[in-house]
Amino acid sequence: AVLVAHEGQDRPVQPVYITAGLAWENAEQQLAARLLAAPIFMSYVRPLKLLQCPVDDIYPSVHWALRGTPPNYATPDSDVYLVGRNALLLSKVAVYCALNRICRIAMGPLAGNPFPDATPDFFSAIARALSLGLDHPIDIVTPFAKMKKEDVVRLGNTFGVPWELTLSCMNPVELAHCGRCSKCRERLQ
């Protein structure tokens, strides 16, 4: 939500949601559609584009993200790593961008993100590889990479982000936070 508001300050935004078959996606996708229909976004957000990039053929069927059994509340970020997630998402969305003459992809990793596919070196390398492979310039920006979550929340407050329409949960109950996973813990902190 904050990323969309931030990017929309000076350009139209084409939001993209990529389904991978993960347990939380149905609730997340429904709330994303509601969020993007909120008055704050209406003047600069294009309709949500849905893409598919299933991972059930590469992650084991017992993987917590597929089954909806996330690690517990006290789990550190490093325990919820989804191998290759950003590589897959960026590859998929970059093809969409090339076909639609979009050059900018915004991602929202925060300071302290421990994952190898969320580093400046990774984003720079994959942007170069995708630009070469697609014969289309791809610029991957990460405007919050030096910010902590609380800084992003404060920024979102200045934009008037409707937090009640956001979801940060790995095992939502209908459209509500489960209150038991590490993403719910982060949200409360």
Regions found by a protein language model. Give the residues of each.
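ATP-dependent adenylation/nucleotidyltransferase module used to activate substrates
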Residues: 1-160
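Local cysteine-cluster metal-coordination motifs and their immediate loop/turn environment
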Residues: 87, 91, 165-188
